[in-house]
Amino acid sequence: MLINEHVRERYHFLRVSLTRVAHLVFANSHESNDLKMVENVSSTPKKGVLEDPSTLTPEVVTPRTPGHRIIKAKGAYTKDRSAKRRRGRIEIERHLLGEFDDNVGSNSLLDVPLYSLEAEPLSPSVMLEDESMEGINQSPQGISVEKLGKEDNRSRSSTPASPSLESHEFSESREAGLSQSNGFEARSHGTGFDEYFDKFSQRKTSSNTLSQLPVLDNQVYLDTVKEICTETEQHTQTLVHFQSRNFHQWYFELVNNFNLLFYGFGSKEHFLSSFVEKKLPCFPIFVVKGYFPQLQLKNVLSSFLEFLEVTPAASVSDMLIQSLSIINSPSFSLGKIVFLVHNIDGESLIDERFQSALAAIASSKNVYFIASVDHVNFALLWDTSLESSFNFVMHDATTFARYYNETTYENSLGIGRANVSNKEKAIKHVLYSLPANSRGIFKFLLIHQLERMMDTQDFDARQGEKVGIEYRSFFQKCSAEFLCSNEPNFRSQLTEFFDHNIIESKRDVSNSEILWVPYPKNLLEILLEDMMEDV
């Protein structure tokens, strides 16, 4: 309140000064006799004597008239009033308009020198002008200013002011503004994805693993599933019956040299089998169950050649060429055949070689190729060339039927472990991405290690150096098989296996480097059998 009284005095002083200057300019421009802002002052006025403005006689004067001067407000703060004007404007906006920012106000007030809150005597002309101007401004804002002034006068008379109080208030306002700005900066730096990682970076990782959970027997799981009675079985049968109305359309597309691909939620094995039996009963049918985990391209091509009543060749590439030459022959004895693939996106079929072989068979005009998919991203399996070879017409065949046969071989978590492990899938993925010479080096190492395992009793995979091969001897044997040209090339090819922990090395007592594959015997046999298809 004391600060408001000080601001009020400065505000009235500024208003009186501006009013007198405006009247003076108006008088000089129009040379009016009615203006009362010019007073005849004697050349030697008496100091300390205050004359009544009502007794003064106005006269028309010019700036050149000697002995006459313009009455100016005198006071301690007459010379520099720019900071005071800004301070008065800020306080008026704070109390009257209510649109003042605290941060801006505190910083602006800091630019103004701290004034004492003790009452200072006003200029005589200012005091008279203040009394004469009373009651002119009757707006609501003016009324609020007068009320504040009266309250401030009472507070000034009862409480002595001290300069330290004002300094303390200014310091508090400055600290409040700085704290608000610092809080805003802290909030701005904590937004976005950085805050997420900062928040969860200190969380501890649990030491629990899935291997600690009890394993459910596979047969118990199957028996429990059979006992479950689905309430939507009737609706499922209705949906299958509705889908069967499209059998004629699908058969028409097959006759016009298009292949069929069915997608949608639910098992489609029995549904597609019924379609083939009803619409294509006169044609030989070859079925591939892609959900079987141990399915290999060599086994599929060998069975397909036996289906065609032809003796299979030795290698996979020869069997594929042999199959294509038979089904594309004009004198093909069987005429048309049906090639049905359940789950063409199965784990065993997603290999690029497998998909290329199936696409080559599907491109034959003597083959009615029908397949089903269950993965939502099945389209990523094929590039433009394979997609053109398949020549699929896709249909939604949602049945909501239970995946009974498809999940029988699945290695589900918490259920009886299947023979195929994730390690086998990872190793196969790495091998398929390597050149032929690198795969030949790995196959040569597998053959040597399996031979040593046959002679070793109670072999432990953690002691693989016992069945490993010495580095220098292994390099010479690979060079004899033309798998590498020099030792740097041989070392660079082994680097890929070292990076994926497929091959490990260790130095023995004689400081010789030993190489071996740190996996169980059954896994090595599966890998070797799969690699023998390339022979």
From Swiss-Prot:
Keywords: Chromosome, DNA replication, Nucleus, Phosphoprotein. Residues 156-165 have a biased composition (Polar residues). Changing residue 65 to D: Does not affect function on preventing rereplication. InterPro entries: ORC2, RecA-like_ORC2, WHD_ORC2. Phosphorylated by cdc2 and cdc13 (in vitro). Phosphorylation appears first in S phase and becomes maximal in G2 and M when cdc2 kinase activity is required to prevent reinitiation of DNA replication. Changing residue 62 to D: Does not affect function on preventing rereplication. GO terms for cellular component: chromatin; DNA replication preinitiation complex; nuclear origin of replication recognition complex; nuclear pre-replicative complex; nuclear replication fork. Residues 166-175 have a biased composition (Basic and acidic residues). It comes from the Eukaryota. It holds the Pfam family RecA-like_ORC2. GO terms for biological process: DNA replication initiation. GO terms for molecular function: DNA replication origin binding. The modification Phosphothreonine is found at residues 44, 57, 62, 65. Its main location: nucleus. Residues 132-184 are annotated as: Disordered. Belongs to the ORC2 family. Component of the origin recognition complex (ORC) that binds origins of replication. It has a role in both chromosomal replication and mating type transcriptional silencing. ORC binds to multiple sites within the ars1 origin of DNA replication in an ATP-independent manner. Together with cdc18, plays a role in preventing DNA rereplication and resulting genetic instability upon cell cycle-regulated phosphorylation by cdc2. ORC is composed of six subunits. ORC interacts with cdc18, recruiting it to the ars1 origin of replication. Interacts with spb70. Interacts with spp2; preferentially associates with the unphosphorylated orc2 in G1 pre-Start prior to orc2 being phosphorylated by cdc2, the interaction is mediated by spb70 and might enable the association of the whole alpha DNA polymerase complex to orc2/spb70 complex on chromatin. This is Origin recognition complex subunit 2. It comes from Schizosaccharomyces pombe (strain 972 / ATCC 24843). The lineage of its organism: Eukaryota, Fungi, Dikarya, Ascomycota, Taphrinomycotina.
